[in-house]
């Protein structure tokens, strides 16, 4: 449990999240308009999106399937009967004068997700609901000193709003939840999770209280657009509320915005209640009825999800839970790992993957899908180390060439003459030379200066251009120096 340190004692965080995830779909929720990001303004707007008189919405079946799959991934109840409602409010970039959403009967309810806590335990976060709704357009106020401009490309794009219960007890837990949810959506393929492009946005409902007291008055922070800012926004807002309460003031229930530059929240508007939106069923859309057959079909076609992969990696490949989580955090990395792990030692592969390959990818600012090293060639490199064909030091040289060229490791070793020397006779000859050339060091070592052993190893490696098998060198040197 994390606390906010006030002047009069400790306060608890109480946090609930609302995640707006843009559905991965080529067309909008109720029209056939394209959803391509960053298209020319108002180039992806149908008569339905612009709310022209007489235009009727037609539900996108693919978006419904994406919501069902997400609900299944969240271990939630898929409601076989759900209804679309009109959420009535006026805004310039909402041409209908209302948003089509699901208030009374959402498509998904009662899910859960487990997140790691600071103590290393798992904590279950309850998910109240997932409902479908359409996005609004975009108002632009910086194009002219006299006018605001409206871009309706985004109007009507399908969203899944995923709402948690107030089970989150720290800014770090909130960040963990969003990271894990984003990864789940990416594995399912229902949302790309790109917060920078606005395809995943987070609202945080925050209140504070003394331990054991009832829930306090909450404020909602809108449209937080990064994991880092989720932590910053919650920390600032909770401290602001504590300062007000400790000075005898009341918390006003309101909607606030987070300024990433100043790290502060500011008032946007007073918080509305459901009655303010005058929800009622949309008369242009029939209730959505979902069959058991459809649910079972979508469930059968779900990919292997992150938690399932972590369990598989720890059991089948004997990886640590930490290593498994690192690999599973990126679906492309997990796919790469599995292709390579079938051909070599998974543990050794993991070490090279998370250190050498990740390091080079970060340095080059590219993803694993852009890497020139194929999973098969990466596995070959690991096997060459495993069977002592090359040393770890030589392997790093080979790896760097592989990363630059994409060549197979055995071809590089052949071209560069980098095969590891593991012949006892050859190594004994080199060791004899090193001992003969350094009599004083030999005497020092035999008189108890054990640190000199590293000097002898270094000399052998130098004479063999780093190609000597280090394990064998250690063994043979100890035998020679102790005789």
UniProtKB/Swiss-Prot annotation:
Q: Where are the disulfide bridges?
A: none
Enzyme class of the recorded protein, top EC level = ligase
Q: Which gene encodes it?
A: gatB
Reactions this protein catalyses: L-glutamyl-tRNA(Gln) + L-glutamine + ATP + H2O = L-glutaminyl-tRNA(Gln) + L-glutamate + ADP + phosphate + H(+); L-aspartyl-tRNA(Asn) + L-glutamine + ATP + H2O = L-asparaginyl-tRNA(Asn) + L-glutamate + ADP + phosphate + 2 H(+)
Protein name, per record: Aspartyl/glutamyl-tRNA(Asn/Gln) amidotransferase subunit B
Which domain of life does this protein belong to?
A: Bacteria
Pfam families recorded for this chain?
GatB_N (PF02934), GatB_Yqey (PF02637)
| Biological source species | Rickettsia rickettsii (strain Iowa)
UniProt cross-references to InterPro entries, sorted A to Z: Asn/Gln-tRNA_amidoTrfase_suB/E (IPR017959), Asn/Gln-tRNA_Trfase_suB/E_cat (IPR006075), Asn/Gln_amidotransferase (IPR018027), Asn/Gln_tRNA_amidoTrase-B-like (IPR003789), GatB (IPR004413), GatB_C_1 (IPR042114), GatB_Yqey_C_2 (IPR023168), Gln-tRNA_amidoTrfase_suB_CS (IPR017958)
What does the subunit section of this Swiss-Prot or TrEMBL entry state? Heterotrimer of A, B and C subunits.
Its family remark reads:
Belongs to the GatB/GatE family. GatB subfamily.
Keywords associated with the record: ATP-binding, Ligase, Nucleotide-binding, Protein biosynthesis
For this UniProt entry, the molecular function terms from Gene Ontology, in alphabetical order, are:
asparaginyl-tRNA synthase (glutamine-hydrolyzing) activity; ATP binding; glutaminyl-tRNA synthase (glutamine-hydrolyzing) activity
Which EC numbers characterise this protein's activity in its record?
6.3.5.-
Q: Name one GO biological process term.
A: glutaminyl-tRNAGln biosynthesis via transamidation
Q: What task does this protein carry out?
A: Allows the formation of correctly charged Asn-tRNA(Asn) or Gln-tRNA(Gln) through the transamidation of misacylated Asp-tRNA(Asn) or Glu-tRNA(Gln) in organisms which lack either or both of asparaginyl-tRNA or glutaminyl-tRNA synthetases. The reaction takes place in the presence of glutamine and ATP through an activated phospho-Asp-tRNA(Asn) or phospho-Glu-tRNA(Gln).
């Amino acid at each position: 449990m994390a606390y906010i340190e006030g002047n009069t004692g400790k306060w608890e965080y109480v946090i609930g999240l609302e995640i707006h995830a843009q559905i991965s779909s080529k067309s909008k929720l109720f029209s056939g308009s394209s959803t391509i990001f960053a298209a020319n303004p108002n180039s992806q707007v149908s008569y339905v999106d612009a709310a022209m008189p007489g235009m009727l919405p037609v539900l996108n079946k693919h978006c419904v399937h994406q919501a069902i799959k997400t609900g299944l991934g969240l271990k939630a109840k898929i409601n076989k009967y759900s209804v679309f409602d009109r959420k009535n409010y006026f805004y310039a970039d909402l041409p209908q004068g209302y948003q089509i959403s699901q208030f009374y009967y959402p498509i998904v309810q009662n899910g859960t997700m487990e997140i790691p806590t600071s103590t290393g335990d798992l904590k279950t976060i309850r998910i109240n609901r997932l409902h479908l709704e359409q996005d609004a357009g975009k108002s632009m106020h910086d194009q002219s000193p006299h006018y605001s401009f409206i871009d309706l490309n985004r109007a009507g794009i399908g969203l899944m709003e995923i709402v948690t219960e107030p089970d989150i007890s720290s800014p770090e837990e909130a960040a963990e939840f969003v990271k894990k949810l984003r990864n789940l959506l990416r594995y399912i393929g229902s949302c790309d999770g790109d917060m920078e492009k606005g395809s995943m946005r987070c609202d945080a409902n925050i209140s504070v209280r003394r331990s054991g007291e009832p829930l306090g008055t909450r404020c909602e922070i809108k449209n937080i657009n990064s994991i880092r800012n989720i932590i910053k926004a919650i920390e600032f807002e909770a401290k602001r509320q504590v300062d007000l309460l400790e000075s005898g003031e009341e918390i006003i229930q309101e909607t606030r915005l987070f300024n990433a530059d100043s790290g502060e929240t500011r008032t946007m508007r007073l918080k509305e209640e459901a009655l303010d939106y005058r929800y009622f069923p949309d008369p242009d859309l029939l209730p959505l009825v979902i069959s058991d057959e459809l649910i079972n079909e979508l469930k059968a076609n779900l990919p292997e999800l992150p938690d399932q992969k972590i369990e598989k990696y720890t059991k089948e490949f004997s990886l640590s839970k930490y290593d498994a989580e690192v690999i599973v955090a990126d679906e492309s990395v997990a796919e790469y790992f599995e292709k390579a792990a079938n051909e070599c030692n998974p543990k050794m592969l993991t070490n090279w993957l998370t250190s050498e390959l990740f390091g080079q990818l970060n340095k080059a600012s590219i993803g694993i899908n852009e890497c020139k090293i194929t999973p098969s060639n990466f596995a070959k490199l690991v096997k060459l180390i495993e069977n002592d064909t090359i040393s770890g030091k030589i392997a790093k040289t080979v790896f760097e060439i592989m990363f630059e060229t994409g060549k197979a490791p055995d071809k590089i070793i052949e071209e560069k003459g980098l095969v590891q020397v593991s012949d006892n006779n050859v190594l004994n000859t080199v060791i004899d030379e090193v001992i003969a050339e350094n009599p004083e060091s030999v005497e020092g070592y035999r008189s108890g200066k054990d640190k000199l052993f590293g000097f002898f190893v270094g000399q052998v490696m130098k004479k063999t251009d780093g190609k000597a098998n280090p394990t064998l060198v250690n063994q043979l040197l100890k035998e020679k120096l102790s005789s």
